[in-house]
Curated annotation (Swiss-Prot):
One of its GO terms (cellular component) is CKM complex. The lineage of its organism: Eukaryota, Fungi, Dikarya, Ascomycota, Saccharomycotina. ATP binds at residues 65-73, 125. Residues 460-472 have a biased composition (Basic and acidic residues). This is Serine/threonine-protein kinase SSN3. InterPro entries: CDK (IPR050108), Kinase-like_dom_sf (IPR011009), Prot_kinase_dom (IPR000719), Ser/Thr_kinase_AS (IPR008271). Residues 1-23 have a biased composition (Polar residues). One of its GO terms (molecular function) is ATP binding. Residues 59-418 form the Protein kinase domain. The keyword Zinc-finger does not apply. Residues 1-25, 450-472 are annotated as: Disordered. Its cofactor is Mg(2+). Keywords: Activator, ATP-binding, Kinase, Magnesium, Metal-binding, Nucleotide-binding, Nucleus, Repressor, Serine/threonine-protein kinase, Transcription, Transcription regulation, Transferase. One of its GO terms (biological process) is negative regulation of filamentous growth.
Length: 472
């Protein structure tokens, strides 16, 4: 039998009697095979590219909002009235929707629908490509060739987490697009963020944020954080610029680029990200070099945000010691930031933080903080003109040195502060006499497709020219 004969192949001649011609044996013909060109990925990718909708086909870019380390954000509106998002069904499948249980019954409901939803407005985040180019590397036509090394870890994290999470206090992703090696994440649009609101109340004149608004915003932040923690996720970058608020006063936690699952990590938290949380909102255990930490780092950040809502300025505004670019494996000791914390909360001791001696930077801490500072939080609270004892108690519970006894997000939701009048609402703006200005949009910089970089619009915190001493 000829070795090329395969009785299981229907394309071969299956009968021995048919393999002769005029009594002379013939050689079986091989099976019909697709050409290598058809089997390669190129034609398939080309066909997919032809049917894939582009970002400009689906969305009209209204203007440019801001830039950060991740990339750029644009305001846009749908060209299809929200009825044909390619990934909408994908976003609604396999979502986790726990965390809105009985505790939410205490929140006053409102009938105001978000105007952002009615007008189908979106925020489109364009991630920076993880690429590098060589000026001496050109094609045969003399055009510069850009080599792409892949998708950033931050983009992968945010995409994977946002597609699985569904909670009204977490910013919702409605679409993900890949075009020309750029990734676009499309989120529901929020007209405000806490940084913008704080700046409105502090400039040019100081106008304290009403207690009702602070209470409603804080409760909704804690509700979103509770949802994340119940799903084994910590945010790791909570700060005012990452807390969005819709025009109807609903809080949305955004920017999950540093968020991470903590129930079964593939590598240690420190190995993956040596520096997490913006310096002013970074928990003391992180400042002391903790290699392993817990979701309590998010609660410290919430405490810092609450204090900032109360006082209209960061409570611990330290200066960050930068990483030595020649030794990126070494994280510098953040003496100045710890100094700001100690001045308000007092010097931590083994009495109020028994495990402090276990942290890698404890010896450096002892060296720089030989003098003992007394607790000063009550004086700080009185100085800013606040009077609620329960609010002060919640703040103390959130800004607890020892992470093992720091209040959890779930317990904070039922703190006495939220039970006393005025009762909070899902509309944080309810009853306000003023309306907050809309987010600033740069309409002359709306080219979302180009790779040009915008500067001076980062939203990481206060610029020096945006802060001043509060009038006493």
């Amino acid at each position: 039998m000829n070795s090329g004969y395969n009785p299981g192949n229907a394309n071969h001649i299956t009968s021995h009697s048919n393999r002769t011609k005029n009594g002379v044996p013939t050689i079986p013909q091989p099976a019909l095979m697709a050409s290598n060109a058809i089997l390669t990925i190129g034609p398939y990718k080309h066909r997919k590219d032809l049917i894939r909708e582009s970002v400009l086909t689906k969305y009209q870019i209204i203007g440019y909002i801001a830039a950060g380390t991740y990339g750029k954000v644009y305001k846009a509106k749908s060209k299809t009235n929200g009825n044909s998002n390619s990934n909408s069904a994908l976003m609604n499948d396999n979502v986790i929707s726990i965390g809105n249980g009985q505790k939410e019954a205490g929140l006053q409901k409102t009938n105001n629908e978000s105007m952002e939803d009615k007008n189908q407005l979106f925020a489109i985040k364009k991630f920076k490509s993880d690429n590098h180019s060589n000026k001496n590397n050109h094609d045969i036509n003399g055009n510069e060739v850009i080599h792409y090394t892949g998708i950033s870890q931050s983009a992968i994290r945010e995409m994977s987490l946002c597609r699985e999470l569904s909670n009204k206090n977490i910013t919702k992703v409605v679409d993900i697009l890949l075009e020309n090696k750029s990734i676009y994440m499309v989120f529901e649009y929020c007209e405000h963020d806490l940084l913008q609101i704080i700046q409105y109340h502090s400039h040019p004149d100081v106008k304290p944020i009403p207690d009702f608004t602070i209470k409603s915003i804080t409760w909704q932040i804690l509700n979103g954080v509770t949802f994340l923690h119940k799903n084994w996720i910590f945010h790791r970058d909570l700060k005012p610029a990452n807390i969005m608020v819709s025009s109807s006063g609903v809080v949305k936690i955004g920017d999950l680029g540093l968020a991470r699952k903590f129930n079964n990590p593939l590598q240690s938290l420190y190995t993956g990200d040596k520096v997490v949380v913006t310096i002013w909102y970074r928990a003391p255990e992180l400042l002391l070099g903790a290699r392993h930490y817990t979701p309590s780092i998010d609660l410290w950040a919430v405490g810092c945000i609450l204090a900032e809502l109360l006082s209209l300025r960061p409570i611990f505004k330290g200066e960050e010691a930068k990483i030595d670019m020649n030794n990126k494996k070494s994280v510098p000791f953040q003496k100045n930031q710890l100094q700001k914390i100690v001045e308000v909360l007092g010097t931590p001791t083994t009495k109020n933080w028994p495990t402090i001696t276990k942290y890698p930077e404890y010896s450096a801490f002892q060296q720089h903080f030989s003098n003992t500072y007394p607790p000063n939080l009550i004086s700080w609270y009185k100085l800013i003109g606040r009077t609620s004892k329960q609010c002060l108690n919640l703040l103390r519970c959130l800004l607890e040195y020892d992470p093992t006894i720091r209040i959890t997000a779930d317990d904070a939701l039922t703190h006495a502060f939220f039970l006393e009048l005025p009762k909070m609402s899902e509309n944080s703006f309810e009853g306000l006499s003023q309306k907050y200005p809309k987010r600033r949009i740069y309409t002359h910089e709306n080219d979302i497709v180009s790779n040009s970089q915008h500067v001076n619009n980062k939203r990481h915190g206060y610029d020096d020219n945006m802060t001043r001493k509060r009038q006493r």
